[in-house]
């Protein structure tokens, strides 16, 4: 047991560069890769936490109307059902929320439509 304590003390005194070199030499001597184990360990808890953090509702935000405001106003009207004045105010007041609480697929579709009209869009 005293030998193990001595090894622990010796390893604790290593610099980062020395520890990295030790790992490299042990990998070569034993024919293993130390990189595989930490990746597996890091992937396990992250995979378990991912479903909890996965968003189901997204908000489409008009970041900038771009140079072609008329087309963007038309697209905003089609998406939101707003009147001409309300859609114009929304576009000119960018950044503004266009639609909230939508599914990811719908949010991506709305983003494509608005970007095709010349707007800069964010999905949050």
UniProtKB/Swiss-Prot annotation:
Subunit structure as annotated in this protein's UniProt entry: Homodimer. Part of the ribosomal stalk of the 50S ribosomal subunit. Forms a multimeric L10(L12)X complex, where L10 forms an elongated spine to which 2 to 4 L12 dimers bind in a sequential fashion. Binds GTP-bound translation factors.
Gene3D superfamilies: 3.30.1390.10, Single helix bin
GO CC annotations, alphabetized: cytoplasm; ribonucleoprotein complex; ribosome
Superkingdom of the source species: Bacteria
Listed name of the protein: Large ribosomal subunit protein bL12
Keywords: Ribonucleoprotein, Ribosomal protein
Matching CDD domains: Ribosomal_L7_L12 (cd00387)
Family indicated by similarity: Belongs to the bacterial ribosomal protein bL12 family.
Role this protein plays: Forms part of the ribosomal stalk which helps the ribosome interact with GTP-bound translation factors. Is thus essential for accurate translation.
GO MF annotation: an example: mRNA binding
One annotated GO biological process: translation
NCBIfam families: L12
